[in-house]
């Protein structure tokens, strides 16, 4: 969690995985790598690589996935919030997890 929080305000760059810029899966990959867990650099591949949990089971650090096909992932921080690298022109930020295109959640 601390690794993800330390990236707040850094720019979104498609294909980037830190340390100066990130895309969504690059951010989750970078944060979990700091905790000793390897993840692929693709939201869909991350979803397929980890154990799925229900939204009611979310704990800080869990991943939340969006889109069909899956194209976005964020890191749950608690209180219905996540840290995400959202899109070109934006920065790593806090956002609500509640979106109509939520697919599921997982725990690496």
Task: Please provide the spans of the model-predicted regions.
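Peptidoglycan cell-wall recognition and remodeling modules
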Residues: 1-108
């Amino acid at each position: 969690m601390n690794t993800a929080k330390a990236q707040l305000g850094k720019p979104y760059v498609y294909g980037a995985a830190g340390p100066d810029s990130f895309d969504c899966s690059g951010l989750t990959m970078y944060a979990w790598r700091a905790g000793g867990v390897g993840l692929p650099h693709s939201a869909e591949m991350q979803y397929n690589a980890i154990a799925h949990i229900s939204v009611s089971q979310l704990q800080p650090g869990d991943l939340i996935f969006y889109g069909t096909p899956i194209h976005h992932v964020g890191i749950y921080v608690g209180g219905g919030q996540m840290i995400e690298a959202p899109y070109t022109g934006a920065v790593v930020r806090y956002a609500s997890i509640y979106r109509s295109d939520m697919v599921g959640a997982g725990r690496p």
